[in-house]
């Protein structure tokens, strides 16, 4: 299988962590795709140009970190991250959806902040900064929720990648104002799968 990524993509990092946690590293070739450029050869593989993108052994192509993670998790017939049925599963989906919303907003903020100053939209920067702070304030209050504790699950993986991405955004400071999140993130970052996939600093 071939997994196409961008080294700095938090969405690709989610899948890379699942690959490591599921001990699939020898079966999944990780390939850095050239994205956001004209006429990249990658567009012949994935016309959307997005990452992550998985080409399965049978040629099936999958896009979206949640879909790819679920596929990889079920390959051995013993899923580690599958959600339970009924109310517990609904609660996990609810929390994961809001965590992904946090990541989505930070991704917009990051892209905007990495533009040259004269190309940035102050309105977008303000809107996404305020959204991020609201959500991080919420998670600071709820970090002791059972889904953020105990055995590794998708909520923890996605949230760890979210906070890791937040660290890279210029002029966005969250650690000092969210000490519980800072402590949680430091513990999560010590996992080998997180250490191995730590994103590079933006150029």
Describe these PLM feature segments.
Residues 73-77, 167, 171, 189, ...:
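Hydrophobic/aromatic-lined pockets within catalytic cores
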Residues 22, 178, 191-192:
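Acidic-histidine catalytic/liganding microenvironments
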Residues 183-197:
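Charged phosphate-binding loop/patch that engages nucleotide di/tri-phosphates or the phosphate backbone
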Residues 79-84, 151, 175-176, 195-200:
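Short, hydrophobic secondary-structure boundary micro-motifs
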Residues 69, 73, 93-96, 136, ...:
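Non-transmembrane alpha-helical segments in soluble domains
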Residues 1-123:
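GST-like domain detector, emphasizing the conserved glutathione-binding G-site
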Residues 99-186:
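GST-like fold's C-terminal all-alpha helical module
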């Amino acid at each position: 299988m071939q997994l196409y990524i961008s080294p700095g993509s938090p969405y690709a990092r989610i899948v890379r962590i699942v690959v490591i946690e599921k001990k699939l590293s020898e079966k999944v070739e990780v390939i850095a795709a050239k994205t956001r450029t004209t006429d990249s050869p990658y567009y012949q593989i994935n016309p959307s140009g997005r990452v992550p993108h998985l080409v399965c052994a049978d040629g099936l192509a999958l896009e979206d970190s949640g879909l790819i993670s679920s596929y990889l998790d079920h390959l051995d017939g013993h899923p580690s991250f599958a959600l339970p049925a009924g109310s517990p599963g609904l609660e996990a989906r609810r929390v994961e959806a809001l965590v992904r919303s946090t990541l989505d907003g930070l991704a917009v903020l990051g892209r905007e902040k990495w533009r040259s100053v004269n190309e940035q939209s102050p309105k977008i920067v303000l809107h996404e900064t305020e959204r991020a702070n609201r959500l991080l304030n919420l998670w600071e209050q709820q970090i002791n929720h059972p889904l953020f504790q105990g055995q590794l699950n998708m909520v923890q993986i996605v949230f760890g990648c979210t906070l890791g991405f937040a660290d890279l955004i210029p002029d966005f400071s969250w650690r000092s104002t969210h000490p519980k999140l800072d402590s949680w993130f430091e513990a999560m970052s010590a996992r080998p799968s997180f250490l191995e996939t730590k994103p590079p600093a933006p150029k």
